[in-house]
Amino acid sequence: MDTILKWKSDTDRKKGKRMEPLGVKKKQGSIVEILRDAILHNDIECDTELTQKEIADNLEVSRMPVREALILLEYQGLIRRLPNNHVKVVNFTKGYFAEIFQLGMLLEGKILRQMEKPETMMQQSELSVHREIYRNCHNQLWSKTLESITEIYLEYGIRNIQNQEENKEREEFLHKVLKEAEKKEYAKMEEQLQKYFSCMIHEFEKREI
């Protein structure tokens, strides 16, 4: 499972052409992680139709782990199932990622209002802060929703955005969020949350990460 492959276009797929190599992946990377990254990076384009057999053949694995991966990807909002039991990559329309991150911002703001000593997370990594927030949520539906946003979209963005200046700015906004939450200055906290998530939205909408 070193390589994942792609089609340049749906026309190529219909002509029976094999997917193109996307690049070598670590063997320990799961199928769902490989496919998720390829979709978010736009290596597998929006509206591309996929089958279990095609993916399994190209990744040189059995269909069972592919089937399980596709179930997860559907739950994560990256693919949709078709009547013929194939799947299709969702169409990331303008504002798609903004809506996801705005929901994350809303939920994190509500949870931070309920947390004790949020400033104690200051020494944690950026991703660890987000994980700590959803783990401290007492509403199971909110927690699972925010977990999905964190582990799919935030994790991917934090891992792949290479601009060090932007990374530093984003982390500074997050630290200010925790400081204002600690002081119970919730209006200021939400202002910093807005700035933080706006940075992430901007990067995703460029679709260059």
Could you describe each region identified by the protein language model?
Residues 26, 30, 128, 172, ...:
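A generic alpha-helix signature
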Residues 80-82, 126, 169-170:
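Short, flexible turn/loop "capping" segments at secondary-structure junctions
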Residues 76, 89-140, 144-151, 176-188:
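All-alpha effector-binding/dimerization core of bacterial HTH-type transcriptional repressors
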Residues 38, 42, 152-156, 203, ...:
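A short secondary-structure junction motif
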Residues 1-113, 209:
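Short linear motifs at protein or domain termini
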Residues 2-5, 9, 128-129, 135-165, ...:
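C-terminal regulatory/oligomerization modules of transcriptional regulators
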Residues 160-209:
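C-terminal all-alpha effector/ligand-binding and dimerization domain
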Residues 46-48, 82, 142-146, 189-190:
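Short, hydrophobic secondary-structure boundary micro-motifs
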